[in-house]
């Protein structure tokens, strides 16, 4: 468990600050398998997880969904045969907040616990 995954998400409102470039550079080192991507002008975190079959992929998707509900922060999830793409960003600020890094680390913990 990383120090990020031990943290709890805080409520994020439209006036919450996005992570700075310096914070992004620091936080991304704690979740090295995640890739920062810009989509439609919005910075997001993305990772693809590989599985042996669809049953494992959907089970992982459901566990990530449970974690997201517990945190009150919800990712984009694309479940396909043998893989799940997870994308985190904060809709209210149209970018990345520390919550996204916390949840990315928690997603890694879900995967590592399988």
From Swiss-Prot:
Record's protein name: Putative pterin-4-alpha-carbinolamine dehydratase
Entry-linked SUPFAM superfamilies: PCD-like (SSF55248)
Gene3D superfamilies recorded: Transcriptional coactivator/pterin dehydratase (3.30.1360.20)
InterPro entries assigned to the protein according to its UniProt record, in alphabetical order: PCD_sf, Pterin-4-alpha-carb_dehyd, Pterin_deHydtase
UniProt record similarity statement: Belongs to the pterin-4-alpha-carbinolamine dehydratase family.
GO MF term list: 4-alpha-hydroxytetrahydrobiopterin dehydratase activity
Catalysed transformations (reactions): (4aS,6R)-4a-hydroxy-L-erythro-5,6,7,8-tetrahydrobiopterin = (6R)-L-erythro-6,7-dihydrobiopterin + H2O
Species of the source: Pseudoalteromonas translucida (strain TAC 125)
Record-listed E.C. numbers: 4.2.1.96
Source organism superkingdom: Bacteria
Transferase found in the keyword field: no
Keyword entries, A-Z: Lyase
Span of the signal peptide: none
Enzyme class, first EC level, given as a word: lyase
One of the GO BP terms on file: tetrahydrobiopterin biosynthetic process
């Amino acid at each position: 468990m990383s120090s990020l995954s031990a943290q709890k998400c805080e409520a994020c409102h439209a006036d919450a600050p996005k992570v700075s470039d310096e914070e992004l550079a620091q936080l991304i080192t704690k979740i090295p398998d995640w890739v920062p991507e810009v989509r439609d002008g919005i910075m997001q975190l993305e990772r693809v997880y590989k599985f042996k079959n669809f049953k494992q992929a959907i089970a992982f998707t459901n566990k990530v969904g449970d974690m997201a509900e517990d945190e009150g922060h919800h990712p984009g999830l694309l479940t396909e045969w043998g893989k799940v793409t997870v994308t985190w960003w904060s809709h209210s600020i149209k970018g990345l907040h520390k919550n996204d890094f916390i949840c990315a680390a928690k997603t890694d913990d879900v995967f590592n616990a399988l």
